[in-house]
Amino acid sequence: MSNSRQHQGHFARKRFGQNFLVDHGVIDAIVAAIRPERGERMVEIGPGLGALTGPVIARLATPDSPLHAVELDRDLIGRLKQRFGELLELHEGDALAFDFGSLALPGEKPSLRIIGNLPYNISSPLLFHLMSFAPVVIDQHFMLQNEVVERMVAEPGTKAFSRLSVMLQYRYVMDKLIDVPPESFQPPPKVDSAIVRMIPHAPHELPAVDPAVLGEVVTAAFSQRRKMLRNTLGGYRDLVDFDALGFDLARRAEDVGVDEYVRVAQAACAARAGR
């Protein structure tokens, strides 16, 4: 595969993190994993040159129920409009600032499916941005840097287990589906990639905790990975009775599971509410 940044007459822009998927076998495998169906409400983040967009539209879109897409590159928007017409409704702008909830169908049930080959330079911030729309989302299928996917699905007690692992596992059930080598892209990235499926937990499955406080606790815990939690979570001792929780502070952040972090955040919330 050529290392040229040009593909189909378009120069991939580094500032947009553009690497275009060109391997038809991988594209077919991704579409098979997504299983788009006619009439579903689906949005693609960063459709690029339409490698995934085309096969998805063929299975899903009608003029009355188009595929939605969020794209920042104006040059690509013109090409996509010309190619797909009324079967693709484009939203020009930055996915990090886009209100995905605005695309959900009316009603209480989740209705939105989100897909995309996410720009690797903004993948973590974008995943956190999308968390706020989880109540209206059926599922998400993303191409990401393999290292990020490994962190997303990592188990406690492993080096890959991180703040990203805790926060996303709190909100989603996640599975790594497909490994994708660099040569599947033009230009090839310098890293391996993978497809991940993310399904939000149902409301009744979510622990009753303020996500902001959970994020605060987890961020503190992972702020100095090599230090014991007695140091990184020491500031919470006036709020949380760690002994009563059965929470051992003589551990490092990566050794603590999601449920334990939730209990600490719940205790911190309760203590603050009682003051």
Swiss-Prot record:
One GO cellular component term noted in the UniProt record for this chain: cytosol
EC category name: transferase
EC number: 2.1.1.182
Coiled coil regions, renumbered to chain: none
Keyword S-adenosyl-L-methionine attached: yes
Catalysed reaction, written as an equation: adenosine(1518)/adenosine(1519) in 16S rRNA + 4 S-adenosyl-L-methionine = N(6)-dimethyladenosine(1518)/N(6)-dimethyladenosine(1519) in 16S rRNA + 4 S-adenosyl-L-homocysteine + 4 H(+)
GO molecular function: 16S rRNA (adenine(1518)-N(6)/adenine(1519)-N(6))-dimethyltransferase activity; RNA binding
Keywords assigned: Cytoplasm, Methyltransferase, RNA-binding, rRNA processing, S-adenosyl-L-methionine, Transferase
Localization per record: Cytoplasm
Source superkingdom: Bacteria
Predominant place of localization: cytoplasm
Keyword Heme: no
Pfam families assigned: RrnaAD
Binding positions (S-adenosyl-L-methionine): 19, 21, 46, 71, 94, 117
Similarity annotation: Belongs to the class I-like SAM-binding methyltransferase superfamily. rRNA adenine N(6)-methyltransferase family. RsmA subfamily.
Main function: Specifically dimethylates two adjacent adenosines (A1518 and A1519) in the loop of a conserved hairpin near the 3'-end of 16S rRNA in the 30S particle. May play a critical role in biogenesis of 30S subunits.
Protein name, per record: Ribosomal RNA small subunit methyltransferase A
Natural source organism: Burkholderia thailandensis (strain ATCC 700388 / DSM 13276 / CCUG 48851 / CIP 106301 / E264)
Organism ancestry: Bacteria, Pseudomonadati, Pseudomonadota, Betaproteobacteria, Burkholderiales
Gene name tied to this protein: rsmA
